[in-house]
């Protein structure tokens, strides 16, 4: 199965929301999830953050929505995966996301590319084509006996992405430079790139040089 960067995404959320006390995670119930949940709970408990791990084998979709509607202050949601309900019926992702948006008043982070593009504030994600390449490599290793079918797919080529314009909904106003992330939907004029700064500086130097030259000519 794909092994997403939950730690990195939680850390991103904590940097953006340093007063966070609880993180609610939605994930599937594949093998290894119990160990993952235990590790995350132990790791972030030491940092004063409570991890609430919700999976479809313990909660129906309706129960999950009820849980996240009552999330405490100073918390955020991390959507990893929720593609089936308690009866193993496939859940349509966009329908579910619309319900989550209507239900959850807290910031949403994700490791899922579709969720990021649709509604999340930010996350550490790998593009879908990179997932495909990683899965292909794993299948090749399984077929050649190099690894076992239960081995997770390691996704190392990820991107930290935050949607600038979605901050307002949650009362945030972080600026480019405060986070080492790829910002999306930045309004023009908010951020000047290093190349633009270089052009401005060069232009200013040329103007000053011209003014100095004209002053010498007049004198």
Task: Name the predicted role of every residue range.
Residues 17-24, 46-50:
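Short, surface-exposed connector motifs at secondary-structure boundaries
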Residues 1-20, 127-144:
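Hydrophobic alpha-helical segments within soluble ligand-binding/sensing domains
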Residues 186-219:
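Alpha-helical transmembrane signal-anchor helices
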Residues 25-30:
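Short beta-strand->loop
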Residues 34, 39-42, 48-150:
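Membrane-proximal low-complexity regions enriched in glycine and acidic/polar residues
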Residues 157-191:
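Juxtamembrane amphipathic/hinge helix adjacent to a transmembrane helix
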Residues 103, 151-160:
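Beta-strand-rich non-transmembrane domains
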Residues 2, 32-35:
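Glycine- and acidic-residue-enriched helix-capping/strand-helix junction motifs
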């Amino acid at each position: 199965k794909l092994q997403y960067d939950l730690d990195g995404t939680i850390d991103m959320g904590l940097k953006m929301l340093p007063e966070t006390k609880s993180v609610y995670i939605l994930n599937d119930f594949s093998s290894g999830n119990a160990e993952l949940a235990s590790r995350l709970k132990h790791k972030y408990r030491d940092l004063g953050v409570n991890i609430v791990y919700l999976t479809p084998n313990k909660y129906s979709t309706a129960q999950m929505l009820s849980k996240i509607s009552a999330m405490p202050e100073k918390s955020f949601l991390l959507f990893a995966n929720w593609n089936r309900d308690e009866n193993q019926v496939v859940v349509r992702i966009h329908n579910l996301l619309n319900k989550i948006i209507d239900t959850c008043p807290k910031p949403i982070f994700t490791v899922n590319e579709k969720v990021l593009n649709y509604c999340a504030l930010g996350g550490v994600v790998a593009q879908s084509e990179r997932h495909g390449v990683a899965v292909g490599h794993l299948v090749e290793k399984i077929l050649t006996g190099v690894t076992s079918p239960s081995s997770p797919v390691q996704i190392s080529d990820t991107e930290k992405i935050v949607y600038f314009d979605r901050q307002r909904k949650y009362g945030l106003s972080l600026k480019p430079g405060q986070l080492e992330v790829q910002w999306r939907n930045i309004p023009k004029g908010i951020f000047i790139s290093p190349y633009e700064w270089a052009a401005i500086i060069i232009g200013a130097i040329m103007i000053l040089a011209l003014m100095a030259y004209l002053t010498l000519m007049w004198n």
